[in-house]
Every structure is written in structure tokens, then in C-alpha cells.
């Protein structure tokens, strides 16, 4: 969980999420508050949409920290496909190899291909970066990311491929319809399938 120490310092985009908006918003927050630590916590699919903005971070030496929650999927799209279409997935996997299948709590081989390789891409933009594949290594990696507040840094955190994101709001719903966890999601799916029969 994420604990906030200062009120009014946690910026969310609201709902529905806008893929690709995390890094540009973080850059804006850093320019407006150069003395503050700014961390973009972004999904791999979302970052892919505006990854070229790392050039802005390097060019202007904006110390934006990018933490990529990398499960090799367009995660929210996959989650909706599982919910609405009984797991029939289309065009939501970001690689043709399902190589990321272990939790961040389990060590995976360093040689496993991760696509795209955000560490190599960051290097191409002259932005320091590293990948974390084990929960045991995460805390030290975060410390390294935060060590120099004036330099941009990317931390690629490999997580379980099937990790779901909560809270979520169902299509056509409002904040009153918010789904907070997997049990609520599974109950909502059952109700939807009963209401709509075999169409979903």
C-alpha cells in the first residue's frame, strides 16, 4: 500500500484512466514544483504511449522518477476482457512471449526476455534505469532511484502477469459502483453473466 505523508501531494487522473498521461503529467508536476520529488507510477502499456517524453526529462534534467509496474499487458484492457468476455483476450498482451508469470515476490531468471526492454530504451535517452525481478531487491532499488533528486530515473518492476488493478469502476458506472478487490470483481462478473445470460 501507498502511504501519503503530505496532504494534496498525490496527483491522480481520475476515472476513466487516460493511458499515456502519467509521464507527461509528472513532467508538468516537476516543472511546477522543481524542489519536490515527483514519481510517475505507471503501467508498461501506458508508459509505452508517451515514452519519448524521457527525452524531455534528460534534456532539461528534470528529476522525474518513473516506476514502471510491468506485467507485459495492457492491464486494464485485459482485466475488462476477463470480466466481460470470459477471458477471451485480444490485442492486450504486449509481447508474443508470456515470459512474465511470476510474482515480484519470486525470483525470475535475469536472462528472461522482457519486451519492450525499458532499461535499454531509457539508456537510449541517457536516463539511468534498472529492472527489479524480486521483492527482496525492491526496497534497495527504490533507494537508488530516489538517491539523486535532480536526475531522471526509471525503475522497471516486474510483477505477476495476471495482477489486477483495484479500485476499478465498471463500464457505465459511477464512483458508487466502485469495485475494490478481486472478490467484488468476481461477484460482479457472476451477476453480469446471470443478468445477460450467455452473451458474455
Residue ranges of model-derived segments:
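Thiamine diphosphate
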Residues: 2-200
